[in-house]
Amino acid sequence: MTGPAIFDRLAIVMAHPDDEVLWAGSALRAAGKIILVYGELPGAPELTAGRKAAMAAFPLQTLDWLEMVETGVFDSASWPSPRETEYGVYPHPALRVFDSFDPDRYRRQFHQLRDLLRVRLSGMRNVIAHGPWGEYGHEDHIQVFRAVASLADELGFRLWVPGYRAPKTAVLMQRHLRFLGRPCEALPIDHALAAQIAQIYKDTRT
């Protein structure tokens, strides 16, 4: 093995197309697998079509796009102190933002996602995923973290998460700080690759 230890048998698991370049840009070329979860956003056909075009143009062959349907629960948790659940955070009906709000699908898809990831993460030594507070507080990010974290002991990989937080996620981050280990060393970003991927998302308006 050459390079940092985090690159050894590394998988990246992120919720949406573009999250990989935002939260794991320094590890994209080193990863053996880049797993992106969501595809269609009901009620947003242009975004859905744009994502399909972006994924078709993605420059790395390690991409594995699951194309699960988004559940429209963004910003529906009781921030800044959401109720945590096995499957993520509780999406409150009174706080719905999108017409596609589907908390039942959000609950169901957790188990489907775990099953899909169990196969894909088998044999991995390191996994980069979203943090338990979802960076800026995205309910989809938190669900992806929960699914990945629930498999870490079973499959024997080490889980790494971004340290970024927004003001609204400070409380949730504080709840989880005691579970975090030592940080990874700062790693350089492949600026040319990041710019290439970012341009794809700009061109497809995703």
Listing of model-derived features with the role each one plays in the protein:
Residues 1-122, 154:
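Active-site rim/loop-helix segments in enzyme catalytic domains that contact anionic ligands
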